[in-house]
From Swiss-Prot:
Compositionally biased region (Basic and acidic residues): 152-165
Region (Disordered): 135-211
Family: Belongs to the Abd-B homeobox family.
DNA-binding region: 208-267
Domain of life of the native organism: Eukaryota
Protein name: Homeobox protein Hox-D11
Protein's gene: HOXD11
Amino acid sequence: MTEFDDCSHGASNMYLPGCAYYVSPSDFSTKPSFLSQSSSCQMTFPYSSNLPHVQPVREVAFREYGLERGKWQYRGSYAPYYSAEEVMHRDFLQPANRRTEMLFKTDPVCGHHGASPAASNFYGSVGRNGILPQGFDQFYEPAPAPPYQQHSEGEGDADKGELKPQHSACSKAPSGQEKKVTTASGAASPPGEAVAEKSNSSAVPQRSRKKRCPYTKYQIRELEREFFFNVYINKEKRLQLSRMLNLTDRQVKIWFQNRRMKEKKLNRDRLQYFTGNPLF
């Protein structure tokens, strides 16, 4: 049982807690019989029920805005043939959880505003212009957009703006260095050599890796025979093989180096195969 339920059963002083005004008892002349029963908890307030500067809600609404009851357009869940008193009682006889939500969350009655905005928004718990006439739409203020999003977006744009000049400066620096190197090389070399280099670079494509030259069967057989007798070949024997096999001295030397590495690997594989234990 909420605080609003305790206080709504009072007969004389209908004071809504948290609100800035009293509700006149004349507005509740047609309340049901169970609301007129004396409540078990009588709450006495030191405030006077007759405040001269606060006027009843409906009198303010009808006098200030010049709206007649017959011109109200009902667009909510209530039919137009219901009287204003029944509509008011339907709003106040809702479940407790909805009433508390209406009073403390959605309804602007309990806000600390003046009498006119509170009076204009008294029946606005269903939704925007759900029961109220169209003349009350001007008193609904749309929720302002959160300013921190704009601020964060502005900061993000500023950060991007700061990063772009840095990136452009970094990109300009290598290009400037390359220009300096090219100018220095151009100044060091005479113009004739520069023209020759340009012509050579345009005519000759980019140098690729030299193609592999496989040995013939005869060359491999003679090299294997020599490797069988001498793993490390001396210089005289290497020159003799190079003349006989029509190879260069460097080719014979590299072949023996590769053959020794291959033999070492084969010996390790044989040992691992026979022992069954890997050797590291």
